[in-house]
Amino acid sequence: MRSPGEVLREGELEKRSDSLLQVWKKKRGVLTTDRLRLFPTGPGARPKELRFHSILKVDCVERTGKYVYFTIVTTDRKEIDFRCAGESYWNASITLALIDFQNRRAMQDFRSRRERAAAAAAAAAAAAAAEQEPEAGPGGQP
């Protein structure tokens, strides 16, 4: 099992800007078990993070001769366009890391629900057992 924040992959990918011209900007991507960090090429700039809990899916994969284009769709339905070199398969790496994250979260949710259900069942059984005990009368006799 991987530790949270473990780096799975580093390398170059490009993000399409939100500006009117929609130019492609090179970023250094760092993929971990719970997020994708995008570092600008300039020194001292802060990275942007896409945490997996806010990513819905990786979509719209298209291959051209040189690039693979893909879109990350967030839980608020925002679409962020990326491209990477055809042989780098960043889209597959991000998709697999996202699926792994979602599976881990689903297992945690399942365990939490099961523990809550077991605690509720134990409390109900204890309450039922308490109701079944005869009340003691004077002198400790029922």
Swiss-Prot record:
UniProt family annotation: Belongs to the PHLDA2 family.
Recorded topology in the membrane: Peripheral membrane protein
CDD domains given in the database record: PH (cd00821)
Location within or outside the cell: Cytoplasm; Membrane
Organism: Bos taurus (Bovine)
Keywords, in A-Z order: Cytoplasm, Membrane, Phosphoprotein
The keyword Cell division appears for this protein: no
Function: Plays a role in regulating placenta growth. May act via its PH domain that competes with other PH domain-containing proteins, thereby preventing their binding to membrane lipids.
Classification via SUPFAM superfamilies: PH domain-like
Recorded GO CC terms: cytoplasm; membrane
Record's protein name: Pleckstrin homology-like domain family A member 2
